[in-house]
Amino acid sequence: MAEWLYEKGLGENRALLLDGGHAVEAHLEVFPGPLQPGDVLSMRVIEIQVQGRRGIVRLSAPDDAPDTNPDFEAILEPLPERTSLKSEVLVEIVREPIFDGRVHKRAKARPAAPDAVPGGASALRDRIEATDHPIRTVEPYGPDLLEEAGWSEIIEQAETGQIDFPGGSLSIIPTQAMTLIDVDGWLDADALALAAAEAAGRAIRLFGIGGSTVIDFPTVSNKDARKKVADAVMAGVGEGAEATAVNGFGVMQII
């Protein structure tokens, strides 16, 4: 049976879902953050980039933060029709602000549902409780059960984007348009693609990779082999995602 390990630490909370002794989901909750996925907030429109499609909204910053701090801004897509500059819009944050090592990226938001109530996102503990898997609380001063389950290796993989599997490796490369997963290895094309598909599916779920994800597999021999590769990816990703078939060039997109 799958089980959560949960630790409430200083400045961060950690959770790891184990199934059969293997980590299948990792979550890290870091404080503080002005815009977090799931927040429903009233934000002011400061720029209309494409009327009816895209704009930039800003949360009023506290007195000790400059009003131009991009950590308090989000890209709103779609922008509601007839929205004007300086108007207030109720939005839901779908991605926190991130820095990819080159560019600071604003948070992403979408219009909140008509019945949405302003408020902060559910805490990590609340989210994992909603999964109905049992939770084992790990005390910060006791044995580090998360470390024993491979936490440091998971963090290293997330930071480097490099994941090894028998017969090859994955390189996970975030870009402004999508997340790209590149495959390299020494098996024959069909075997490498299938092994990579299983590893990629696990990685997408483990790291919670969302948005548009493109996997570049080696070109496999036939349509049946491509279907096996696509099925292996989706088996690892789990429910809730949609994907294209693997095309003749070995490319698959997951949304």
Indicate residue ranges for each PLM-predicted region.
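DE-rich acidic low-complexity regions and acidic surface loops
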Residues: 1-255
